[in-house]
Amino acid sequence: MSVRRSASLAVAAIGFVTLAACSSSSSSSGSPGSAASSPAKLKSIFFANPLPAYPDWATADKCFKSETAKLGIKGVTQGPTGLQINDQFVLDRISQAIAQNYGALMAVPITPSAYEPLFQRAKSKGMEIATLNTGTATKTQNLEVGTDYGTQGAKVAANIGRRPGQQNVGIITNQAGGIGDVIINAFKSHLPANVKVVATAFDGGDPSKTVDVAEQLLTAHPETNILFSWEGTAVAGISTAIKEKGKVGKVFGVVNDLTPQVVDGIRGGTIYGTSRQHFCDMAKKAVDLLVAVSQGKQVPPTTDTGTTFVTKANLDAVLAEAKDES
């Protein structure tokens, strides 16, 4: 194992150790909005952020606070630190929010079966619920806002197919089933003639394991020239594996989200492209739709905020657009 990889894994380990002990909490308003200051019946929203340390979810936090402040609504966000999902931490914070009588809840039910009972309890207390980026994985919410993963998977396949020559894809995902399969199955169902999936490997959703998983895939399937992962936290491992295997310029990552690591990878030649999800738009629309629900208005059960496929060709333009949006 290289010194560079050892350092990156140490950082990941530190993030995991501190995960259970710390949280991120912020409020866009010191107290619940009064009837005079709020345009709606809704006075407070709790946002259970799954990964506030991840750059795009940090953007969602920022835009959530901006939108709730604009509307005079108390907006509080909490979530674990580090870059590894901690469902139990988030579930505990949702339980607290229910006990504190928040008017509405925004959440990302990564493990739907664990979240559904809490959603039912929240609804029984009169809370409105918006889920983000998980489609119809749960049933009790009033509405869902975020990326349509089926559409995203098809778009990724089409963009890989625009590369010249045969594209042999190795997929890296957390596990079989779940939200990842929605993207992957759509990807597989829309493969252009020059794109073939040669292998699928699992890293357990642990970014400290991705580099080894990626290197093993490249060793077992040397014909691979694309490593595709929907996991935003897999980027560093994919880029490191490509470098350590001496495959820069021969193998390229196709990943998710537009984080600083992804930008560096695109500019450095380890990442071909990424799906930029619109996290700011997600957060703001979720707030606005919850307000509409509280006013008795009809809202769509799902709202697709779309993705933009980003390569070196449009990177600077998309970065400028992202800066303006947030």
Question: Locations of the language-model features?
Answer:
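C-terminal motif of bacterial Sec signal peptides marking the signal peptidase cleavage site
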Residues: 17-21
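A residue-level marker of the well-folded mature domains of exported/periplasmic proteins
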Residues: 3-5, 22-326
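Bacterial N-terminal signal peptides that target proteins for export
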Residues: 1-11
